[in-house]
């Protein structure tokens, strides 16, 4: 068919991967990122590559109310676990409204199975960052919170005795870029989901699980 497939990415960040796809395929790409600087960067890349594009700095609710085509695919990477229940509901409405029959949704999220052991560490880190650090500098607050968490766990409380990797996790976090940690761990909204939870949520809007996009998981060796 000569008809162009249409794709939409919710929360495209700097828009790099979105532009790569737009430049290397016959599809027509739409997307939004609430950060105006991110959206501006994505649009500059698209204009430099001379690819048709529709990139916005709209909220999910604003995008829901736009006059948009039906999409063959809708993607959200690094979004679902870091937004409010209200925004999750809006995204479900968006998918139900704009996904073509037989369309595909790609969704990534923090999986409970992998995160369960580190959730108390994140809660300790986040609580000190939000309530106890005396600094007004976010990067210093990250360092203060990690130092506090490390000092607490080195006292070998019962939690650390039962979860010996907790201290190692904090020490690993201290090696990370503080800006990354703010985004990854310190959002106001932060949730983990089991696989079955996500399946049930998406079944409510008539989606059926198709498979993992990690190609390695489909190989025997």
Please give the residue ranges for each predicted region.
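Rossmann-like AdoMet/SAM-dependent catalytic core
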Residues: 157-221
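Conserved SAM-binding loop
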Residues: 42-43
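Conserved SAM-binding loop of SAM-dependent methyltransferases across substrates and taxa
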Residues: 14-26
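A short glycine-rich, Lys/Arg-flanked "PGG" loop and its adjoining helix->strand segment in the class I
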Residues: 89-101
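Conserved class I S-adenosyl-L-methionine
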Residues: 107-136, 141-158
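Conserved SAM-binding strand-loop segment of SAM-dependent methyltransferases
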Residues: 50-60
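Conserved SAM-binding motif I beta-strand of class I
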Residues: 28-33
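A short acidic, Gly/Pro-enriched loop at the edge of an enzyme's catalytic core
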Residues: 65-74
């Amino acid at each position: 068919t000569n008809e162009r497939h249409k794709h939409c990415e919710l929360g495209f960040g700097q828009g790099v991967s979105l532009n790569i796809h737009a430049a290397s395929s016959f599809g027509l790409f739409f997307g939004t990122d609430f950060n105006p600087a991110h959206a501006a960067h994505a649009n500059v890349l698209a204009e430099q590559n001379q690819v048709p594009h529709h990139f916005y700095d709209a909220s999910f609710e604003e995008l829901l109310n736009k006059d948009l085509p039906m999409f063959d695919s809708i993607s959200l990477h690094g979004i679902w676990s870091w937004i409010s229940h209200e925004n999750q509901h809006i995204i479900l409405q968006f998918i139900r409204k704009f996904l073509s029959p037989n369309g595909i949704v790609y969704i990534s999220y923090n999986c409970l199975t992998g995160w369960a052991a580190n959730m108390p560490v994140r809660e300790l880190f986040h609580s000190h960052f939000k309530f106890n650090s005396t600094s007004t500098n976010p990067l210093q607050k990250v360092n203060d919170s990690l130092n506090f968490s490390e000092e607490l766990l080195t006292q070998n409380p019962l939690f650390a005795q039962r979860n010996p990797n907790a201290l190692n996790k904090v020490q690993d976090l201290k090696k990370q870029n503080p800006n990354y940690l703010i985004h990854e761990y310190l959002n106001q909204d932060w949730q983990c989901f089991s696989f079955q939870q996500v399946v049930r949520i998406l079944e409510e809007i008539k989606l059926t699980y198709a498979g993992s996009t990690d190609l390695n998981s489909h190989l025997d060796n």
